[in-house]
């Protein structure tokens, strides 16, 4: 069956309420027959249009608006009104709309979320619901949920503790699960766990929609998380994917290690960021013509993103034949207190793994001059951290320096694409976390900065995991994903400065990632969906969400003529 063909869908809804159901509403695309039989004739203008015209109308309204925040609100209103049309709009130009529904605009939306809140798009579960989380989950109208994105709002992008306002992240993330990965949106559930906030402005804001007290921590917090994980898995199944998003460093690794072997879970800030960064590095190596194990990598930042990338680089270097110990020696990290070295005070267990025998240093410029890295990766959300001197030094040490400014949003980027290319005279191999415009150099070349967006990773991973019912998600999934992404980058893309496939191909990239995950899952006996499909690509494709409107008219058909004869008299 062609997955693009209209699907027949049964509903008891009729009349006005049907037009208020975003899963069923077609707006002006309802045919005359549908309008009459579904009792909505007269509620809509007489004009009947197809979805293509509807998309054009949305884009026209979108382009009339002056701010990205207003554009975000327009798209969120559309999602609340007509789900199929919303995703059709996103998929019509992913490169244009992704920065609005996700980074960088979603950061501004989260800061304004208390003002922008209009209707429920997910579940808010507070610490005071402890002991009753299963009951709160019952409030969600969908019985089948295969993917959850959950946050506690403590570390939203590079913006810090936004508490309940962080709900914009799970909502935006799951929108990309569907637009980029084809995961059914009705099977996705955004959740915010509200345990309070340390944000003074929010605590004093009378319009703040969350709990107005300090964050609950320690054993009570852990018991709350344990209950949530147990309740969600009990209700939706042990194969329900639970993605952790924007938890603070002190909890992110701890919770991942605690739950990864019991539930189907991953942390996108750690593992997703790692995968997309390593994908960029693998693509960059096709330019430098050497191996990953030949690199010396310096991180500005030592939080969950940096450590996640570092661990995946080690795994990739091991695959090239290097020992774990030697691989770790090629990785250096700088945190807020300076270079991470052995004997330095207050090192966490995760940071200790990458501590070197070296003198203590604090100044990043001096550290770069001393270490002479071949690759410099920024994930500390310190805007402008890669100074002109650092960029000059990187270009002096390397013919083709690898410079990744991965912090979000744009204001937190370590340097801009233009700064990087101009200082290095176009020799830098650059990638960023937020989008930057193409840069034209004095010699006439135009370079297109690669955007190392996690959206290349998590939609495909989610699609693959959900499709085959993968029970646990290990780190090899993310190395495999990085390899698949890098393989989609053509030589022409590399010449243009792109380290990632064009965003308009992201749905195809996600399909390839998902198919590889499904293949490996069955090969390693980790899948739970049986019988095993013979054609894995066809199997995954058949499960991808279609934006074509469903057929919701009653299933009408005829009987044979002889049985339809009207009896007019009783036989004696």
Swiss-Prot record:
GO cellular component, one term: mitochondrion
Pfam families linked to this entry: malic, Malic_M
Residues annotated for a divalent metal cation binding in this entry: 245-246, 269
Localization annotation: Cytoplasm
Modified residues (N-acetylmethionine): 1
One GO MF term attached to the UniProt entry: magnesium ion binding
Active-site residues per Swiss-Prot or TrEMBL entry: 102, 173
Catalysis performed (reactions): (S)-malate + NADP(+) = pyruvate + CO2 + NADPH; oxaloacetate + H(+) = pyruvate + CO2
CDD domains attached to this UniProt entry: NAD_bind_1_malic_enz
GO BP term, example: malate metabolic process
Cofactor(s) essential for the protein: Mg(2+); Mn(2+)
Residues the entry annotates as binding NADP(+): 155, 269, 301-318, 408
Residues annotated with Phosphoserine modification: 336
Keywords assigned by UniProt, alphabetized: Acetylation, Cytoplasm, Metal-binding, NADP, Oxidoreductase, Phosphoprotein
Main location: cytoplasm
Cofactor: record remark: Divalent metal cations. Prefers magnesium or manganese.
Keyword Nucleotide-binding recorded: no
Site positions per UniProt: Important for activity: 269
Expression across tissues: Ubiquitous. Up-regulated by 3,5,3'-triiodo-L-thyronine in the liver, kidney and heart.
EC number of this enzyme: 1.1.1.40
Similarity comment: family membership: Belongs to the malic enzymes family.
Function: Catalyzes the oxidative decarboxylation of (S)-malate in the presence of NADP(+) and divalent metal ions, and decarboxylation of oxaloacetate.
Protein name: NADP-dependent malic enzyme
Gene: Me1
């Amino acid at each position: 069956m062609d997955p693009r063909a209209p699907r027949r869908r049964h509903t008891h809804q009729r009349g006005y309420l049907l037009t208020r159901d975003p899963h069923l509403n077609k707006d002006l695309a309802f045919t005359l027959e549908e309008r009459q039989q579904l009792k909505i004739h007269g509620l809509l203008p007489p004009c009947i249009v197809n979805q293509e015209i509807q998309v054009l109308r949305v884009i026209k309204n979108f382009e009339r608006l002056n701010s990205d925040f207003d554009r975000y609100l327009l798209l969120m209103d559309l999602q609340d009104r007509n789900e199929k049309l919303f995703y059709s709009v996103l998929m019509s130009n992913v490169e244009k709309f992704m920065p609005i529904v996700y980074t960088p605009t979603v950061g501004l939306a989260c800061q304004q979320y208390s003002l922008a809140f209009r209707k429920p798009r997910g579940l808010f579960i507070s610490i005071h619901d402890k002991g009753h989380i299963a009951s709160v989950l019952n409030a969600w109208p969908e019985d089948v949920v295969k993917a959850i994105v959950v946050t506690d709002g403590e570390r939203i992008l590079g913006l810090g503790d936004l508490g309940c306002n962080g709900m914009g992240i799970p909502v935006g993330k799951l929108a990309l699960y569907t637009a980029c990965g084809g995961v059914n949106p009705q099977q996705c559930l955004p959740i915010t766990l509200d345990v309070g906030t340390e944000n003074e402005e929010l605590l004093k804001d009378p319009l703040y929609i969350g709990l107005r007290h300090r964050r609950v921590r320690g054993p009570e917090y852990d018991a709350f998380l344990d209950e949530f994980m147990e309740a969600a898995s009990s209700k939706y199944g042990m194969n329900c994917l639970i993605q952790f998003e924007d938890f603070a460093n002190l909890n992110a690794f701890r919770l991942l290690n605690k739950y990864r072997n019991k539930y189907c879970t991953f942390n996108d800030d750690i593992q997703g960021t790692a995968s997309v960064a390593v994908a960029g590095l693998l693509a960059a190596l096709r330019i430098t013509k050497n191996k990953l194990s030949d690199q010396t990598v310096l991180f500005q930042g030592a939080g969950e993103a940096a450590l996640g990338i570092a661990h995946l680089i080690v795994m990739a270097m091991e695959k090239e034949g290097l020992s774990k110990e030697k691989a770790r020696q090629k990785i250096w990290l700088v945190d807020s207190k300076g270079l991470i070295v052995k004997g330095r005070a207050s090192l966490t267990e995760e940071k200790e793994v990458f501590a070197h025998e070296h003198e203590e240093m604090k100044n990043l410029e001096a550290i770069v001059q001393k270490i002479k890295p071949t690759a410099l990766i920024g994930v500390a959300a310190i805007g402008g951290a890669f100074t002109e001197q650092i960029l000059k030094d990187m270009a002096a040490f390397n013919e083709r320096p690898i410079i990744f400014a991965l912090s979000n949003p744009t204001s937190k980027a370590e340097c801009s694409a233009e700064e990087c290319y101009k200082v290095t005279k176009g020799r830098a191999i650059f990638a960023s976390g937020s989008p930057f415009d193409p840069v034209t150099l004095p010699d006439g070349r135009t370079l297109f900065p690669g955007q190392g967006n996690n959206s290349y990773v998590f939609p495909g991973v989610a699609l693959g995991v959900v499709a085959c019912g993968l029970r646990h998600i290990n780190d090899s999934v993310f190395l495999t994903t990085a390899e698949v992404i890098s393989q989609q980058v053509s030589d022409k893309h590399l010449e243009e400065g792109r380290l990632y496939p064009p965003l308009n191909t992201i749905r195809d990239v996600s399909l390839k990632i998902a198919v590889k995950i499904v293949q490996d899952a069955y090969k390693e006996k980790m899948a739970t969906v049986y019988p095993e499909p013979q054609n894995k690509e066809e199997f995954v494709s058949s499960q991808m969400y279609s934006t074509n409107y469903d057929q919701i008219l009653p299933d009408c058909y005829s009987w044979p003529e002889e049985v339809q004869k009207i009896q007019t008299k009783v036989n004696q």
